[in-house]
Amino acid sequence: MAGRTILLSAGGTGGHLFPAEALAHELRARGWSVHLATDKRATRFAGTFPADEIHAIDSATFGSRNPLALLKSGLSIWRGFKQSTALINRLKPAAVVGFGGYPTLPPLYAATRRQVPTLVHEQNAVMGRANKALAPRVTAIAGGFLPESDGPFASKTVLTGNPVRPAVIQASGTPYAPSSGRGVFRLLVFGGSQGAQYFSQVVPEAVRLLPATLRSRLRIVQQARPEDEGPVRSAYDELGVKAEVSPFFTDLASRIADAHLVISRSGASTVSEIAVIGRPAILVPYPYALDHDQAANATALERAGGAEIVPQEKLSAERLRGLLEVAMGAPDKLAAMAAAAKSVGRPDASRLLADVTEAIASGETVTEFKRRRSA
């Protein structure tokens, strides 16, 4: 399919692969042939990726300071660059799109050397290292939270938002229904593995400190690590609080839609899903996140009025008890927060990302694309 091929490149984690998969679906629906370049580890769980072909490209990280390890990493990336150049020469893609992670460096760098239009998508409000290295060279930057009007690359940045799952789009149709003064109050608590561990300690204790009249209103859904699941469930049972505790929820989107309040970490996907569905949140950024990207992501929602940020070191059980007590007594405030969160949601992120991809593939500049979009 000469001239109608797009090459996508994503690092070997779900966080990088998911937005690439969402774009692939959208591009294929528009008649494009889609290929994926990734590292060997990702090929194990990219079997359902909607690509005409998946290409394993050599790559490596520079996590070690050992000279031999650095040399080995450099050689792997050089091999990946040569492989990527050969792949681009064969496929002749109209554009190459990267989604972060070190495995994107060889294909994107090779594309810029071959003067193929290039785009990187950054999920977070702070650029990751691979995207930051590529930013000066690429044609365009699509951002989940990156501003279009500020920063060294603002002139070629388009705020597309982050693609979300179809289940999230479906859940976004559920309007927020505030809890009445004495009615059931549904609290959803979730996070990554470390997030679930911390919340497993502090949330049950905060609930214990609540007045009995408020505890009786609570219905809690909480993610917990397998080793914490039993103790967390027992803690709620002892308090007489109805709770559903599990290491994983396959229907998380509908759980968010059912919640009156969400307590969570603030990874890019989490913040994007909360915003699209439109629910008030207490966000606790993971304190050890690289480049503090979770804090920056949370700020985007807080600035809109849809969330309150509490650093982990300040989230004591007593502090959380106070936040819950205020929230349970302020249904109008929570409804306003839900509306504010939804106002910054981007349910059309996949479509916008495909629009930018097609624009650069046709030779259009970001400035021209923005002008056309605003006309």
Curated annotation (Swiss-Prot):
Topological type in the membrane: Peripheral membrane protein
Positions annotated to bind UDP-N-acetyl-alpha-D-glucosamine: T13, G14, G15, N124, R165, S193, Q294
Enzyme Commission no: 2.4.1.227
Any matching Pfam family: Glyco_transf_28
GO CC annotations, alphabetized: plasma membrane
Annotated InterPro entries: GlcNAc_MurG, Glyco_trans_28_C, GlycoTrans_28_N
GO molecular function: UDP-N-acetyl-D-glucosamine:N-acetylmuramoyl-L-alanyl-D-glutamyl-meso-2,6-diaminopimelyl-D-alanyl-D-alanine-diphosphoundecaprenol 4-beta-N-acetylglucosaminlytransferase activity; undecaprenyldiphospho-muramoylpentapeptide beta-N-acetylglucosaminyltransferase activity
Pathway membership: Cell wall biogenesis; peptidoglycan biosynthesis
Family affiliation: Belongs to the glycosyltransferase 28 family. MurG subfamily.
Role played: Cell wall formation. Catalyzes the transfer of a GlcNAc subunit on undecaprenyl-pyrophosphoryl-MurNAc-pentapeptide (lipid intermediate I) to form undecaprenyl-pyrophosphoryl-MurNAc-(pentapeptide)GlcNAc (lipid intermediate II).
Protein name as it appears in the record: UDP-N-acetylglucosamine--N-acetylmuramyl-(pentapeptide) pyrophosphoryl-undecaprenol N-acetylglucosamine transferase
Organism: Chelativorans sp. (strain BNC1)
Gene of this entry: murG
